[in-house]
């Protein structure tokens, strides 16, 4: 039996159009459709510098928690002393978050590997004896994670079985860990002509973008010139680094650089894409690019890391990480096979509608809330 009048305090990144904020917003909307009361608690983080020219940082209603050192995170070239001060100041954020959540039944912490929403605020969990039940969704594991902090959460949510296995191996009790897929918002297919090859997200090396540039160079050397459109929220420094790498590979004239998109524009560009990429060289646990591509019926070329294959199944086209030659071969073969493009897109959408709806994600999440309350 579900507790009536359940209240949840969602601690999350809330920057407009950042993937984790989109995740939280979609989950919150689905929870509220089930009469769950949700309060959003957020703070500034290092991504703030990406919004320097924007008049709007956040979505909807929220409670903003601040510390004296927040401005240091907005400095791309901060000194080592300021960097240390900023990192250290993230720890007491855990107390400040909990203070805002003290009247809720559940404190649901959306953890990324970014400072204000990373593991540092969770270091206060062991000494927070009173307060709501704590549920932590781990979107990305830190490179050097402090796994002990998860022992003090009432439940931990991860996005793939691979991620769960990694945490069990680190000693986290298996009965605390729940696998809940990253959701995707259902969209209507508009019958748009698919003519674009696109990359969504930051054009960074850790996203596989540099491997993609090398693959484009390999194809160009074989007489196949492919234009690539880049969409996402990224800073000028990231863009300049990526442009330098494009010049080094002699493909700079093939890249069109675009900025962030509204939700409607994102789906439109996705539906105009022949295929897109999730070619991470390291595990990314629950990619919103994959889920959104699937909902839009767009084929995905992916590396089989972090559980990508758990989402895509037979609908994915897979390449080894850090292998531009294999990537070039897959791009060419998929471009030359229109029937395969159509079949993969249809199967991906069917799979997404079956497993990845936000209503299904919310139902699983509510059952986890209930389990920690009943424990």
Could you describe each region identified by the protein language model?
Residues 9, 189-207, 213-216, 229:
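Conserved donor-binding/catalytic core segment of Leloir-type glycosyltransferases
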Residues 143, 154-188:
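Donor nucleotide-sugar binding/catalytic pocket of nucleotide-sugar-dependent glycosyltransferases
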Residues 227-241, 259:
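Glycosyltransferase donor-sugar binding loop
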Residues 333, 340-355, 364-367:
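A short, well-ordered alpha-helix in the C-terminal region of glycosyltransferases
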Residues 240-267:
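Nucleotide-activated donor-binding/catalytic signature segment of Leloir-type glycosyltransferases, i.e.
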Residues 314-324, 333-338:
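Conserved acidic donor-binding segment of nucleotide-sugar-dependent glycosyltransferases
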Residues 270-285, 298:
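Acidic donor-binding loop of glycosyltransferase active sites
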Residues 21-26, 204-218, 240, 291, ...:
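A conserved mid-protein helix/loop that constitutes part of the nucleotide-sugar donor-binding site
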């Amino acid at each position: 039996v579900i507790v009536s009048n359940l209240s949840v305090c969602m601690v999350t990144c809330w920057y407009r159009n950042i993937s984790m904020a989109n995740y939280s917003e979609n989950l919150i909307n689905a929870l509220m459709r089930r009469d769950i009361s949700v309060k959003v608690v957020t703070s500034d983080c290092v991504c703030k510098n990406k919004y320097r020219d924007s008049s709007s940082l956040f979505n909807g209603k929220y409670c903003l928690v601040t510390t004296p050192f927040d401005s240091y995170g907005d400095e791309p070239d901060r000194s080592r002393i300021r960097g240390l001060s900023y990192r250290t100041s993230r720890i007491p954020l855990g107390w400040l978050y909990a203070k805002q959540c003290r009247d809720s039944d559940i404190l649901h912490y959306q953890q990324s590997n970014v400072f204000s929403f990373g593991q540092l605020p969770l270091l206060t969990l062991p000494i927070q004896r009173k307060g709501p039940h704590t549920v932590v969704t781990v979107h990305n594991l830190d490179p050097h994670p402090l796994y002990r902090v998860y022992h003090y959460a009432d439940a931990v949510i991860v996005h793939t079985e691979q991620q769960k296995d990694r945490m069990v191996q680190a000693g986290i009790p298996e009965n605390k860990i729940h696998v809940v897929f990253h959701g995707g918002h259902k969209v209507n297919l508009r019958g748009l002509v698919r003519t674009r090859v696109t990359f969504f997200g930051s054009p960074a090396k850790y996203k596989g973008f540099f491997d993609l540039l090398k693959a484009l160079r390999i194809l160009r050397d074989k007489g196949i010139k492919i234009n690539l459109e880049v969409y996402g929220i990224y800073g000028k420094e990231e863009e300049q680094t990526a442009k330098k790498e494009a010049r080094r590979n002699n493909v700079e004239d093939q890249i069109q650089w675009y900025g962030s998109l509204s939700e409607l524009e994102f789906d439109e560009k996705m539906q105009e894409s022949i295929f897109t990429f999730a070619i991470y060289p390291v595990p990314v646990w629950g990619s919103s690019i994959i889920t959104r591509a699937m909902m839009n019926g767009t084929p995905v070329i992916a590396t089989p890391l972090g559980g990508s294959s758990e989402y895509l199944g037979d609908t994915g086209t897979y390449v080894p990480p850090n292998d531009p030659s294999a990537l070039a071969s897959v791009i060419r073969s998929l471009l030359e096979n229109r029937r395969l493009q159509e079949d993969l897109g249809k199967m991906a959408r069917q799979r997404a509608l079956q497993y990845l709806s936000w209503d299904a994600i919310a139902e699983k999440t509510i059952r986890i809330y209930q389990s920690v309350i009943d424990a």
